């Protein structure tokens, strides 16, 4: 559990401190993001017997592949950002200082694994997600559902 929290703190810190253009984060954020994904993969492996973890691990793995293949940043489709109504985020990504994400270009590898699926209003939190994100969402749902059913049976 502690490693999941550490990975979340690293990723949140990258977004928060990167947005403030902290040089250390801008220079080493890629490595920190990759490290956070390695932590999540380790936790998934360690807990592989729990229902839903394999889907979570697959989602993390797919996101990890596209991030590593694209210089340590998750590519995002510009058209999907507009469809989701995330116009301000487009401007942020065009600046090129956002540590964890970048816009898809002609050089982007594994585009089909990138953040290309818009979740627009009326979705409560408009965003753009990847296939890996959906697998993780479903895996977490399955994990929670299984835990609730086990508790109910005891």
What are these regions (language model features)?
Residues 62-86:
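Transmembrane alpha-helix/helix-exit interface in multi-pass inner-membrane proteins
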Residues 8, 60, 112, 127-130, ...:
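Hydrophobic transmembrane-helix microenvironments that flank and shape a buried ionizable site
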Residues 28-35, 126-138:
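Membrane-interface loop-to-helix entry segments
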């Amino acid at each position: 559990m502690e490693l999941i929290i550490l990975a979340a703190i690293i990723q949140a810190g990258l977004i928060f401190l990167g947005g403030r253009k902290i040089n250390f984060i801008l220079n080493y954020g890629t490595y920190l993001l990759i490290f956070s994904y390695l932590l999540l993969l380790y936790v998934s492996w360690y807990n592989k017997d729990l229902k839903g973890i394999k889907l979570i691990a697959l989602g993390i793995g797919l996101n990890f592949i596209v991030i590593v293949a694209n210089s340590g940043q998750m590519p995002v489709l510009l058209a999907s950002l507009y469809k989701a109504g995330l116009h301000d985020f487009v401007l942020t990504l065009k600046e090129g200082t956002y540590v964890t994400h970048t816009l898809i270009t002609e050089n982007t590898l594994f585009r089909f694994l990138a953040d290309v699926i818009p979740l627009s209003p009326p979705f409560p939190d408009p965003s753009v997600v990847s296939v890996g994100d959906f697998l993780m969402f479903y895996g977490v749902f399955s994990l929670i559902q299984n835990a609730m059913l086990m508790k109910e049976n005891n």
